[in-house]
Amino acid sequence: MRNENTPIAVEGYPFIAIAGVLTLILAAVSWHAPVVWAGTAFFLTVTLFVAFFFRNPERITPGNENAVVAPADGVVIYLGPAREEHLGVETTKISIFMSVFNVHINRAPVSGTVLDTFYVKGKFLDVRDDRATFENEQAGLVIETARGLRLAVVQVAGLIARRIVCYAGKGDRLTRGGRYGLIRFGSRLDIYLPTTTEVKVALGEKTVAGETVLGILP
């Protein structure tokens, strides 16, 4: 499983290269046609924004092995009971909304083994709409911890973010706080925890992937 620690996620390289080349071409043309400077400035801004979007910062994960860390940067937009079909039980669901300004690298919420993966084709509704959980395109992992506890984490594509990237596969071993995927240009992460988890976040709270503790497993 890939787990790059480059300052910018490799998935961003093609976008940065295209925007960068266009910037250089327009910059060269602008020496002879000053009016083109506006286009040069525009594509330079785009290049910088794309690099900013795909930034891949290091994170310091809490030492408590029972702590479930946020899989994504963003804001908690849902917190409550929910049944997750791949787990087959009632769970505590926490949903995190990622705007285009958040880091979009996704991190493993716990250490454990990937028991199953799933991908569901679907719509591209605004991910702040709870229907997105059931109707949008999504990819998920079922993870089992060393103590036999199971949880699921689901990447949900959105109105703008229509490209889910997941490095993890069935049988892979995840390390809490380790990178396992990303979603391009804003989206949502749903995490389904055992109902006995001691929740440590509230609606509207900001999260930092790999650092914010969502809850403590029993």
Swiss-Prot record:
EC category: lyase
GO molecular function terms attached to this record: phosphatidylserine decarboxylase activity
InterPro entries xrefs: PS_Dcarbxylase, PSD-A
Residues carrying Pyruvic acid (Ser): S187
Described purpose of this protein according to its UniProt entry: Catalyzes the formation of phosphatidylethanolamine (PtdEtn) from phosphatidylserine (PtdSer).
Annotated family: Belongs to the phosphatidylserine decarboxylase family. PSD-A subfamily.
Site feature: Cleavage (non-hydrolytic): G186, S187
Catalytic activity, as annotated: a 1,2-diacyl-sn-glycero-3-phospho-L-serine + H(+) = a 1,2-diacyl-sn-glycero-3-phosphoethanolamine + CO2
Oligomeric and partner information: Heterodimer of a large membrane-associated beta subunit and a small pyruvoyl-containing alpha subunit.
Protein name per Swiss-Prot or TrEMBL: Phosphatidylserine decarboxylase proenzyme
HAMAP family, per the entry: PS_decarb_PSD_A
NCBIfam families per UniProt: PRK05305.1-2, PRK05305.2-5
Recorded superkingdom: Bacteria
Cofactor: binding details: Binds 1 pyruvoyl group covalently per subunit.
Gene Ontology, cellular component aspect: plasma membrane
Entry cofactors: pyruvate
